[in-house]
């Protein structure tokens, strides 16, 4: 070592942070003796095993629509079997347009090396339906702009109440004649307004029996494939849009059903 005198002892302490996230504390002691520059070194490294990559966490509330391309035995609704009667006038035609508005939330973990881990939750606004997804994929930025593209796949579970029934019976009393009627809905709705009027009138005279019940809950499991686009207008906020197509098994084994979801909303990242 240059400028090292006999018997001189030098020491250095340093902290290094590597891009891969391994932090090391090094302690080095040097001892210079004579013209030969003999050096005795001792290095102690303490590594804290942190995640191997730097990452950003983002949060995105979403609005969207849900639909399913449908063309088999399951035409009346999710998990509802179409009637087997020969009268084809009662058969619902295949449909492809989205029909259910959604509100949801995304939480995503995006690493600098492109790894993407995302959790999504959606709830329908017009019926009782909930959908949760766990996705893993790859996110990248084309060019040097503020736009990010992503592709991911994973696991999906959808749960919904698929039928409801309202039963109304009127006992013979006063001007009311004995009668009964029923109303079934293909998804979750309030009873029709006409039944509501009859209910109010009958309750006034105390001559009504009303029964409402939910017939079942359906759970569908699928493998979703999601394409996403993010554009950031600032360092920590932007807009996020996703399109998801699900492939899986309907618990009622519909012949042809491909659910899809279109969602958009603001995104905030760390």
From Swiss-Prot:
Pfam families: DUF2715. InterPro entries: DUF2715. To T.pallidum TP_0127, TP_0315 and TP_0618. This is Uncharacterized protein TP_0619. It comes from Treponema pallidum (strain Nichols). The lineage of its organism: Bacteria, Pseudomonadati, Spirochaetota, Spirochaetia, Spirochaetales.
């Amino acid at each position: 070592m240059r400028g090292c005198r006999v018997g001189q002892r030098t020491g250095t302490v340093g902290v290094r942070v590597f891009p891969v996230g391994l932090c090391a504390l090094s302690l080095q002691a040097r001892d210079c003796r004579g013209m030969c520059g003999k050096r005795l070194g001792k290095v102690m490294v303490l590594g804290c095993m942190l995640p191997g990559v730097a990452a950003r966490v983002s949060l995105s509330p979403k609005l969207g629509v849900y639909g399913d391309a449908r063309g088999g035995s399951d035409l009346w609704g999710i998990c509802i079997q179409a009637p087997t009667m020969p009268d084809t006038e009662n058969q619902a035609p295949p449909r492809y347009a989205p029909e259910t508005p959604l509100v949801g939330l995304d939480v995503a973990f995006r690493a600098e090396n492109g790894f993407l881990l995302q959790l999504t939750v959606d709830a329908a606004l017009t019926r009782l339906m909930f959908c949760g997804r766990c996705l893993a994929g790859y996110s990248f930025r084309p060019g040097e702009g503020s736009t990010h593209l992503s592709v991911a796949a994973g696991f999906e579970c959808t749960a919904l109440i698929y039928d409801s029934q309202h039963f109304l019976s009127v006992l013979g009393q006063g001007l009311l004649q004995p009668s009964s009627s029923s109303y079934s809905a293909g998804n979750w709705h309030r009873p029709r307004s006409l039944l509501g009027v009859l209910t109010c009138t009958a309750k006034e005279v105390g001559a009504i029996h009303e029964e409402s019940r939910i017939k079942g809950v359906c759970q569908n499991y699928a493998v979703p494939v999601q394409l996403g686009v993010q554009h950031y207008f600032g360092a920590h906020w932007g807009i996020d849009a996703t399109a998801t197509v699900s492939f899986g098994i309907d618990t009622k084994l519909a012949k042809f059903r491909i659910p899809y979801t279109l969602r958009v909303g603001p995104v905030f990242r760390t």
